[in-house]
Regions:
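Sec-dependent N-terminal signal peptides
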Residues: 5-14
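N-terminal amphipathic/hydrophobic interface segments
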Residues: 18-138
């Protein structure tokens, strides 16, 4: 019971720190299991990971928030991402998704994205869900 409270308290502190240091307006991360490693300044999320921000929803098997680098590294089989904006709709998937503090997104490994009746497949797709700008690297 004591460990459960420590995880909840640590997660609460993580949430406060995430919202105070990053320009991401609203990021909500849910998972079945959370581990906070204070000395590494990392928070790990396992099983049924769902990440919601102002612009995107991401589903995956696991995620790690690195406070030093201000990036969330998301892994899945595959991980999936979709927009929350009607005027800039897209959906995609990749083995790994890197979600940066400015909400720029990298889809890495067997990456694909669909938007405006266009499909892109590449090993690396970089895009900004705010502006819709997309680049890829084959």
């Amino acid at each position: 019971m004591k460990n459960k409270h420590l995880i909840i308290i640590s997660f609460f502190l993580f949430t406060l720190d995430l919202s105070s240091k990053n320009p991401i307006n609203h990021v909500k991360i849910e998972s079945d299991k959370v581990e906070f490693i204070k000395n590494l300044r990392n928070v790990s999320f396992f099983s049924n990971v769902n990440i919601n921000s102002s612009y995107v929803e991401i589903s995956a098997n696991s995620a790690i928030f690195d406070q030093k680098k201000e990036v969330i590294s998301i892994s899945g089989d595959p991980s999936s991402i979709k927009s929350k904006k009607e005027n800039n709709f897209f959906n995609g998937e990749a083995e790994t998704i890197l979600f940066f503090s400015d909400e720029k997104v990298h889809l890495v490994g067997n990456a694909s994205i669909k938007f405006d009746n266009i499909s892109i497949n590449s090993n690396l797709i970089i895009f900004n869900p705010k502006t819709g700008k997309i680049t890829s690297d084959n």
